[in-house]
């Protein structure tokens, strides 16, 4: 794998060194997280540090943004090419002591083995983003695999287990192309009580009429949907859209 080194300056003035892979969308992804602040990391209160969770970490954009603001980060990413890049990006900035990586696929339960399939295009984030997502019934997962691409076998981890030894979470970000519905389908009230903010890339399914409201129902109505405040507009339709939920 060939890497190119670059550097971004965040809106809060932090300089972040990065590696990107030739022929991929890594640079654009990192730019949107670090320079454009896609997940609104600058808005978070970091006066007491704290812990954040990055599910679907990809190249590490959100993770690096959070680490640069002084948060400890727990990341989840199953694809080996991505986890290698994330570790390189964390290490080059000297933030390894504040970083934990689960090289697993997010799921409703831990300890299962699932087959993930890579997309053939280098610009694809990863197969697990596509093979889960049309249902919150995990029994249907393996029927949603791509028909082409390379396959790997990985173990799963649940949100409950990720947060087992964590007292509080300032932000939980999730971007896993549909897996959010399964991931949150069995989350305990104990885990949800620990989380202050959730930013999710929601992927509507065929039955979804208002995915923002349905996702808030899924997380137990413990949060206020402030998507319109954070992102200025909402397209309430069965499609992809960022959503922000706050206690």
Q: What is the predicted function of each stretch?
A:
Residues 1-247:
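Phosphate/nucleotide-binding beta-alpha loop and adjacent structural elements of enzyme active sites
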């Amino acid at each position: 794998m060939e890497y190119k080194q670059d550097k971004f300056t965040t809106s809060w003035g932090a300089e972040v060194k990065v590696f990107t892979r030739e022929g991929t969308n890594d640079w654009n992804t990192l730019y949107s997280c670090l320079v454009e602040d896609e997940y609104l990391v600058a808005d978070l209160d970091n006066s007491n540090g704290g812990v954040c969770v990055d599910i679907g970490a990809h190249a590490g954009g959100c993770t690096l943004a959070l680490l640069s603001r002084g948060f400890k980060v727990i990341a989840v990413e199953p694809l080996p090419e991505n986890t290698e890049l994330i570790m390189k990006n964390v290490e080059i900035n000297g933030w390894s002591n504040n970083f934990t990586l689960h090289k697993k696929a997010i799921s409703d339960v831990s300890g299962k083995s699932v087959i993930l399939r890579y997309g053939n295009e280098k610009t694809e984030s990863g197969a697990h983003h596509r093979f889960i997502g049309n249902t919150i019934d995990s029994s249907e997962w393996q029927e949603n695999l791509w028909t082409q691409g390379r396959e790997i076998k990985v173990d799963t981890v649940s949100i409950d287990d990720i947060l087992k030894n964590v007292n509080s979470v300032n932000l939980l970000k999730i971007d896993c192309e549909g897996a959010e519905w399964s991931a949150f389908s069995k989350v305990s009230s104990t885990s949800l009580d620990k989380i202050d903010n959730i930013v999710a890339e929601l992927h509507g399914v065929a039955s979804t009429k208002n995915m923002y409201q349905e996702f808030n129902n899924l997380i137990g109505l413990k949060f206020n949907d402030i998507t319109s405040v954070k992102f200025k507009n909402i397209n309430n339709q069965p499609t992809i859209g960022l959503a922000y939920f706050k206690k």
